[in-house]
Amino acid sequence: MKKLIYFLGWLLPLALTAADFSARFEAIKRTATPAALYTFLYALPKGGDVHNHLGGAIRAEWWYAAATDPARNGGDTFYTRVHFTADVKPGVPLVLYQTIRRATYERLTPAGQADYAPLTALSSAQKQEWLDALRLDRPGEGREEFFSWIWPRSGQLHQNIHVVAETMIATMQAYGAEGLRYLETQQGAQSFRDNRGELIPAEVAAKFLQNRLAQPDARATGVTVRFQATVLRFLPNAAQQLEELYEFVDGHRDLWVGLNMAGIEENDKGNPSRFTAKYRELRRRFPTLALSIHAGEMDGPDHHVRDTLLLGASRIGHGVNLIQDPATLLLLQQTRRVLVEINLISNRLLEYTPNLAQHPFPEYLRTGIPVCLNTDDRGMWDSNLTDEYYTAVTTFNLSWEELIQLGRNSLSFSFAAPAVKAQLLAEYERAVSAFTEKYLAPDSLASLATVSPITYGYAKRTWGFPFAQ
């Protein structure tokens, strides 16, 4: 009984503060300038980003800085295609600003090498074009540009473990500045190659990433990182890849906490039901493995979310067309056991919901389906997590309770180990309590003068914010 009284005594002030702050938040939304509201949300403690592709989260500027610094790229040299020769061979992708490593460059014919220039030798105009080629920043760019061109352009940057590790730290630093506590990102250990082009064993790569995360600059960000391994379901060997990654994650549960499946759904290869038998086979061989799977990232109705739940997923990535499947929608509303990972800016830029006012997010949120906000491929959107929060607040008039529950959901439904999750949740609640106390007074927004948001191209193009780039 004494323990219960103590717990209630600790919890009651938090509840009172939250209740008091609800009215305060409504006043802030009514009276603050757009820039002040954005700054307030930038300073807001946030939980986790649990739908995140590390390769897509890295800003072009971070890629360039690491790839051109021998101290950060493991002594490698990167080249990018600046024009095409007349003897390009059939089957070779004609992708301007496709980036390759020195080992690949040295295997090209002299004519092939003539198409490429070192990243360090680009003119100012070429460098800017290279940077812009790695993000959606122009009218008309959308799904086709993203899937067919941007990923191939980034090319072999993803193979260099030094570059990936260093840009991961830059990503963590940016998240830490926004008040994020947990990043659950999709990144494997199977595709790294050394400077000779030889495959790095997954065990070696996993240890390298683990050691890098233990360094002081990584720890100083205040961001806890865990990985998901991701199967590209459209590949011919997707079933084999699924089995291999399932076994890998089972053997590396300290850092890899779950498994994902990604890839465009708009063909028969994206049909989740074709993997049902394989998942059931794997569950007969391995202990429970947490699954978060992309589903419902489609224009029209289908049953992909339902079929993905049958694979064993406890989290759904995107779920845009879930609203067109009433039976599955009702199931998620009533059970409240499955989290839908919402990616507003991604869904807008990839044209699944060009008009975000029509996004099903508020319907899910306000009918009891657990949801959270995430960035998906923030580097390629040239955005950040605060952009997602600002979009949600200004488009759907979120209440304070809804706003804080989004962060809470991201941690509660994370795949972090129970002890880690409990610590993250406790830290989040304490940070929110301190935040509400700081901004409860009517004149408290004056203290936002000490907050310096860092925004990127998306915020500038969408809202015209004059914050630092």
Predicted features and spans:
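Bacterial N-terminal signal peptides
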Residues: 6-15
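Positively charged n-region of N-terminal signal peptides that target proteins for export
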Residues: 1-4
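Metal-cofactor-binding active-site regions of metalloenzymes
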Residues: 19-291, 297-315, 321-338, 343-469
